[in-house]
């Protein structure tokens, strides 16, 4: 199979907010198509290592799916913010810790319809903050100290779905 060319025609913004929604028009193999695209700032995800065998996870309510989810601390990169700056901020906001950040990888989360690129970091040598940063008003976050082997099991048993 070859990489045939896609020819961009137009994009129309249909919602312009912190997250944008647009409709793209393009041609492929002589046919015209339209696709809905969510424009989302890049984001960060942090794996906070408490020790060699233990990490911090969080449990927080996610409105879009109407449930609490167990996940790694994460959040969007604000305008003019570098990925490691966002990771430092999110780690402090969501866990009350600071640490040494090491870049791990990055990946698109849902590239069939969303532009969000998540940068992953490992945080080591964690220190509890004396005056933790306040969470966003709509956040209710519970921190969980979890054995690394249990966190891996959570990925397989459905405890971690985000």
Summary of predicted features, one role per range:
Residues 1-11:
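A short, amphipathic edge element
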Residues 1-2, 68, 79, 112, ...:
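Nudix hydrolase/Nudix homology domain
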Residues 2, 45-89, 137:
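Conserved Nudix-box catalytic region and its N-terminal flanking loop in Nudix hydrolases
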Residues 9-45, 51:
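Acidic, metal-coordinating catalytic segment for phosphate/diphosphate chemistry
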Residues 16, 64, 110-113:
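Short glycine/serine/proline-enriched coil/turn segments at secondary-structure junctions
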Residues 22-29, 111-130, 144:
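Active-site-adjacent beta-strand/loop module that shapes the phosphate/pyrophosphate-binding cleft
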Residues 29, 50-52, 61, 124-128, ...:
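Short loop segments at secondary-structure junctions
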Residues 82-124, 133, 137:
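A contiguous pocket-lining binding segment that forms or flanks enzyme active sites
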């Amino acid at each position: 199979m070859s990489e045939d060319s896609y020819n961009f025609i137009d994009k129309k913004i249909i919602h312009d907010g912190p997250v944008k929604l647009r409709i793209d028009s393009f041609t492929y193999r002589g046919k015209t198509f339209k696709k809905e695209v969510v424009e989302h700032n890049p984001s960060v995800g942090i794996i906070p290592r408490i020790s060699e065998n233990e990490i911090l996870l969080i449990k927080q309510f996610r409105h879009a799916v109407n449930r609490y989810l167990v996940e790694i601390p994460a959040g969007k990169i604000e305008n003019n913010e570098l990925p490691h700056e966002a990771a430092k901020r999110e780690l402090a906001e969501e866990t009350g810790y600071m640490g040494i950040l090491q870049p791990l990888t990055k990946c698109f989360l849902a590239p069939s319809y969303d532009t969000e690129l998540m940068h992953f970091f490992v945080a080591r040598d964690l220190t509890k903050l004396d005056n933790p940063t306040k969470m966003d008003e709509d956040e209710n976050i519970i921190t969980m100290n979890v054995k690394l082997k249990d966190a891996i099991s959570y990925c397989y048993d459905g405890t971690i779905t985000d």
